[in-house]
Amino acid sequence: MAFHNRRWNFTFSCCVVVLLLPLVAARPQQPSAATRVHEEYSTFRVENTEWTFNHLAVDHRNGNVYLGAVNRIYKLSPGLDIQVSHQTGPDEDNRNCYPPRIVQPCSEPLTLTNNVNKMLLMDYRENRLLACGSLYQGICKLLRLDDLFKLGEPFHKKEHYLSGVNESGSVFGVIVSYGDASPDKLFVATAVDGRPEYFPTISSRKLTRNSEEDGMFAYVFHDEFVASMIKIPSDTFTVVPDFDIYYVYGFSSGNFVYFLTLQPEMGGGPTTGSSSAGREQVYTSKLVRLCKDDTAFNSYVEVPLGCVKGGVEYRLLQAAYLSKAGTILARSLGIGPDDDILYAVFSKGQKRRPKESSQESALCVFTLKEINERIKDRLQSCYKGEGTLDLAWLKVKDISCSSALLTIDDNFCGLDMNAPLGVSEMVRGIPLFSESKDKMTSVIAYVYKNHSLAFVGTRGGRLKKIRVDGPTYGALQYETIQVVDNGPILRDMAFSSDQHFLYVMSESQLTRVPVEACEQYSSCNECLGSGDPHCGWCVLHSMCTRKEKCERSSEPRRFASNIKQCVRLSVHPNNISVSQYSVMLVLEAHNVPELSAGVNCTFEDLAEMDGLVEGNRITCSSPAEKEVPRIIVDQGDHQIVQLYLKSKETGLAFANTSFVFYNCSVHKSCLSCVGSPYQCHWCKYRHTCTHDPSSCSFQEGRVKQPEECPQLLPADRILVPVNVVKPITLRAKNLPQPQSGQRGYECVLTIQGVEQRVPALRFNSSSVQCQNTSYMYDGMEMSSLPVDLTVIWNGDFSIDNPAQNKVHLYKCDARRESCGLCLKADPLFGCVWCKGENRCSLKQHCSYPQSMWLEHNGINSKCTHPRITKITPLRGPREGGTLVTIRGENLGLEFSEIKDHVKVADVECTPVPEGYIPAEQIVCEMGKAERSQFAGNVQVCVGECRPEFMAKSSKYYYFVIPQLLSLKPSRGPISGGTIVNITGGNLDAGSNVSIMFKDQKCTYQRRGGQWITCRSHASMQGYGNVSVSVYVDKAHIHKDLKFEYVEDPTITKLEPEWSIFSGNTPLTVSGTNLDIIHTPLIRAKYKNLETINICQVLSPTTMQCMAPELPYSISKHKDVPERPDEFGFILDNVQSVLALNNTNFVYYPNPVFEPLSVSGVQELKPGSPIILKGRNFLPPTPGGNGKLNYTVLIGDKPCALTVSDTQLLCESPNLTGRHKVLARVGGIEFSPGVVHITSDSPLSSTAVISIAGAGGLLIFFIVIVLIAYKRKSRESDLTLKRLQMQMDNLESRVALECKEAFAELQTDIHELTSDLDGAGIPFLDYRTYTMRVLFPGIEEHPVLRDLEVPGYRQEQVEKGLKLFGQLINNKVFLLSFIRTLESQRGFSMRDRGNVASLIMTVLQSKLEYATDVLKHLLSDLIDKNLESKNHPKLLLRRTESVAEKMLTNWFTFLLYKFLKECAGEPLFSLFCAIKQQMEKGPIDSITGEARYSLSEDKLIRQQIDYKTLVVNCMHPDNEKSPEVQVKVLNCDTVSQVKEKILDAIYKNVPYSHRPKASDMDLEWRQGRVVRVILQDEDVTTKIEADWKRLNMLSHYQVTDNAVVALVPKQVTAYNSVNNSTVSRTSASKYENMIKYTGSPDSLRSRTPMITPDLESGVKVWHLVKNHEHGDQKEGDRGSKMVSEIYLTRLLATKGTLQKFVDDLFETIFSTAHRGSALPLAIKYMFDFLDEQADKHNIHDPHVRHTWKSNCLPLRFWVNVIKNPQFVFDIHKSSITDACLSVVAQTFMDSCSTSEHRLGKDSPSNKLLYAKDIPSYKSWVERYYSDISKMPAISDQDMNAYLAEQSRMHMNEFNTMSSLSEIYSYIGKYTEEIVSALEQDDGARKQRLAYKLEQVVAFMSLES
């Protein structure tokens, strides 16, 4: 082929490249095929986005292409290279200027107007092109075809103005020839755009030979009565104001000219009158016919066209094309092959929506013959006087037909009577093909080898190729290709002159597409099965092509054109074993041409050999031994290899078949061996599988059939109770008898991963028994455990178990804590409820007589004492219908037992069989309650209502009345998808809720007590209001709520239409109705990945969006722009904007920055500009105005920028020193390095010289002195040298330390963020969390336990406490009680905190009341604070009152959800980051000091050499699981290593659920035998002087990649601690002591370990000897270094952790973060403080700020930050604690309003964050200001929220125990409290003192 030598520069459509990739890969030996398709696709794109393409014409004589566009006409070569272009616009114009301004001046304002090309016609006779535009009322140019030279442009007469309409697709012209003698005529039809008086809608014009002649475009005939034109009467516009006729296609055939139109219907249907009344206009498609010779247009006839497929009407014409029928289609239609047929594309229905939402369309075919017959029939009936003229738009009123005696033949051209005429009955086309996803928009067709082929363009830019064989055979869509990037494809399509190519056009590109792409099919079946009539199979070249392109295709069987002619190949034998070599194979080939040139046989890439051809048989041999494929166990037992026949003539494979190599020895069981499809035999006694029967004799037990295999037979469930000795007998067949030297049978049971082997006995060939043994499994979580059972013999020969029999081990008492659950167990288990022991056990294990048993079907089979544990819901409507779920114990075993025995609040509740779980759960449906019923408990009787069979709930079920208040938003799009929030009361009652918008459901989503949300559906009723009602079970709640469906939002414009790959550039979006969408999103889809970004609505017509990023890894991008596959918006459910068709959105490559310099540091003088180099800084947008919004920060100061494509010039701000440079653009942030700005020397040259001179003199003087000194003393000289060396040494180490610190800072940040992967966050449950905050350090607090009172006093005490509880719930009493306690001297700070916490535990279930009391107490506190003339800022600073601790507790209760959903994550990340960063360096296990620290006190100030090791640790729970790699340091103590290993293995396990390091020993495993236990102290521990150093890994010389294991602690004295040292018992005692103090610090942070051992006086150390022991000898000073130098490490650590600290602060100090709204409690309390400040006339913002800071950040957050163990299940070490304290201090400083003056003497932790605190302060101020701007929370909303919180945590604490604890204070201060109550008026009225005395009496009464 000659193609691949040329170079082509065409831009190809992407889809073709994709299409071809598999092809190129599959057949590399034929590059030309791919190249050819590549070069056949060529594309011409718009030069300017405004100059969109309109029309297309191809010169069929030479193939040149003419393209009409906005403002341009182009002449292109057949390959779409541009040859000439002719400019047609833009020009000054106004559409209202008639006649246009080029004829006479116009008073309208003129603007530069584009010229749309509306018509492009080839006038072959005169070799010219007619190009009509939209400028100047639609004048036309005549251009010479060769060079587009303008031959003429008539514009001065009114017939020169075709129409002012500026749509390109509503005008059509047909040039008609009348033989050589007469000139041609032009029939032109156009839409008139509401100006019927100026423009005829259809007319015939003269085409003069001379293009400049006066008569050009004159009407063919014109006098005062008649003209060759038709105008639309103005009356028509009074009926349908926007009436117009749109012309879609036109052609001439025979004696007639035809036009296809789309026009509004005039009928008296619903559309009569103004279409603006909201009704949609109905359209109809019609064909118009005129005689060619008719000058008066009497022959005008109109016929409606349409198409019906599958009951769906398609009536809106989109495109049409006239073609010949072709033999096959003609035969099917009953016409001649050369008859004309008309293809037409219609879309569904008759309503033309602005952006037609329906994508459904159909391709239909009409025969012209039938249309003409139908017109002839109508003409005949009309001239008989039947019916009316039926042309409503032209005649407006009905006119009857007049009769006349005429013969009407096929060519009748009408008279001036009965004309023009309309046919009322629609001509139905034959539907060929329909499409519902991608609307068809254009069609063209031709006949190839008798086949009719239609090519259809679609809205999505695709081309469908359809073979049309007619109604009997149907239509086959055989290929679809993506031709243009952005659809739709326009109506004009054209074939090249040789019909090998098709020109397809969208508004922005014209593409040449080959009509066939046969090369894409790589096999004969694919090629001939494709349905493309162009394609056939060229056999020996093994390619799909047209016949004329296949060499010697006329010879027999060399070219296949039918799928039956494809080559078929078979081989015998078609499989062999891998151990057989060079076997002769016979291949039989069918449909092959003669193969005289010879063939080769090829086994893929294994082997190739000559084949011997005899007729159609070919003989080959199989591969030799070294070429046979190796088959390994993983691949199965065989490998399929393709066997190819290669022609020696072409060198190509032309036929292939599958050949199998199999390997029997892969099979390890008899059944799989003999069940293999290959010849495999099983050797029973050798337990092997072979293909060779001779290698396994009959004596060796050869097996061929599955029935003969040794195997276990299916058994019923094998049940074995645990710990019961029992044999297991199994049925089998063909069990082999072990031969001499072979071992006997065993059963292998794998229980929880552990293998248990049991000897077994073979009774005979059909039975085997596992001997008496008992079995056991761990845990009580499973009541039964299926266990795999394998029977083996001779050690490892397993017997097949095809039924996969399992042994079921079971425990009666597991998961059967109640009688009901016990009796529910499988009867075969034999479990009984042992009443005496109150447990479920086997009969034989119950030590009581049988009368004390309950068993399933025994005499006693009914459980007593049913119990109800839970009821949901607890509230419902009176109307009933609520499904109440009752959970409990012993709730019957049969449904019949409880069927009629359930009452809820005294209302019958009918149990539902489906919801019944025996013994555990009843679901019943509530009946209707009376008005008088309000609440009651739930009562269930089992069988009979005797006390022992009856259960009553402790909780009540309440009847409530749900109510509706309002809904928001009250309107949404007609397409639905709006999230509607309905507010009201009691909306969480009942079990089922549904929301109706009139007759339509609104999909329920969530609900709470006062709200329900649902998602609206698309409206069925159209626009307007619908009433909203809610059903809660059977209650129908109705209020006059309305939801309005309004028109869907539309998107009209995007600016700009580009972004960069990383997105996040601002876009302005214009459209309509945008404000009805609450959360609009913008989306992009690329390569099946989707990204979204947010939008903000600014007004109903505009919104601002951030561009989504291109969803594709940036690294895969070359530097080329990309277009997303889809780009659009998610606006609720509005489908029309999901993927915009009218946008050309482009993504340009991201800007790329280069580093500032190789070292990353650039030296600069002040004022010098900083130049950032790179590329893509200015996106190459079409208008060239693509600007990105860059920000460049030097340090934290922005700089002014000048941007070019490769440089950013930054005017550096007035700074000196080192500063990081940071560039931001879109979604990218990049730091090209650091600038170092050094200031110039301020000294003058004279000063410099004089200083230098003075310096010189000084040096001279020093030298003299030194010489003198040297002479004086040699000794001091030596000392000096020694000092000098030490100084050098010190200096180099300082430098090294600084350099290390810097390097660590740079690398650690990255490592840390990548290491902290999303481990689950171990949140504590609500109860544990609140207890840790309320009662810190107390593990088992009484409020968690039941009240402990001696039995004889219990009733008395409970009565007393209930009374006391009522008093606590009395506000007067409670306030008086608290005030009295606070006024007592003995009432300590600790007591205050305790009382506040106890009161809050009692009031947990009544938070509204608690809040009210708290507000009173706080108000008192503020009054007291201001009265005592304290500084108002001190308010709430310290916990000196009950109120302050109550406030902390209040926040503790109400911020749990916020912690869990929002703030917990960054807090946990910070904790993990600190822990991880600390552990990367050495930590002294005794002093708690660390190399990495935020706290100066906990910083190791020495240089410690250490190395990181990786140890491989066995999993303690499962040694078989893979080893875990753990990073440790060689200077870690053994305990530290154990902790690190536990952290790694139990990474996602909460701390309390892990094994403790102290319970485990660390074993170092060296090889299989040697195991050394490593310990902190043992006999090998080194003791120097009186210091003993703990053992580290380096002490044991543990190597990198050593294998270690954690094993439970050994009791033996194996390398145990020497007695003279700190013994293990004393250490563990010490650990226990710490455990109960509740302190978070680790054992190591305590100094006691350093105190010398009393007996031996030995002190223990690890890395540094404690500073207090200043016993280092003077000689050691040489190794010391200035300790302050190590403070740089604080900075390194701070830098590493900065991101985590920022994240935490940002979360806490933002009003809406991570999807969680601001907790109501914060807003409510801040508003309360503001009210109090207003009340006391405090207007100082600092005071208000301080109150808020003291109230929330200091009271709650600081506590949580310092003590993350209050929130998470974790362990906090002393070094972590020290770092968190620094963070907490920074947090406190950020909340303060006072300025901190810092100097070099300030503490390091203040200096560390000094630079960050100002920005944190601004966050805090913004946070407080945002909160104050938020709308106030009403008391009603707050109370609802508090009630909800109370309900959620109702039973967390034991109220009785709490009351008892509070009562202890009453006992202590009885007299004082009673007297305070007697003095208070309110208390006297309520006789509270008397009531308290009653309580005291009850509590002290000794009965």
UniProtKB/Swiss-Prot annotation:
One of its GO terms (cellular component) is plasma membrane. Residues 27-515 form the Sema domain. SUPFAM superfamilies: E set domains, GTPase activation domain, GAP, Plexin repeat, Sema domain. GO terms for biological process: axon guidance; axonal defasciculation; morphogenesis of a branching structure; regulation of cell migration; semaphorin-plexin signaling pathway; synapse assembly. It is a single-pass type I membrane protein. Belongs to the plexin family. It comes from the Eukaryota. Residues 27-1246 are extracellular. Disulfide bonds join C97-C106, C132-C140, C291-C413, C307-C364, C382-C401, C518-C535, C524-C566, C527-C544, C538-C550, C601-C620. The gene is plxna4. Glycans are attached at N166, N450, N575, N600, N656, N663, N764, N772, N981, N992, N1025, N1141, N1189, N1214. Its main location: membrane. Residues 517-567, 663-710, 811-864 form the PSI domain. Residues 1-26 form the signal peptide. GO terms for molecular function: semaphorin receptor activity. Keywords: Cell membrane, Developmental protein, Disulfide bond, Glycoprotein, Membrane, Receptor, Repeat, Signal, Transmembrane, Transmembrane helix. It is found in: Cell membrane. This is Plexin-A4. Involved in the development of primary sensory neurons especially in branching of the peripheral axons. Interacts with the SLIT2 signaling specifically to promote axonal branching of Rohon-Beard neurons and the trigeminal sensory ganglion neurons. The chain crosses the membrane at residues 1247-1267.
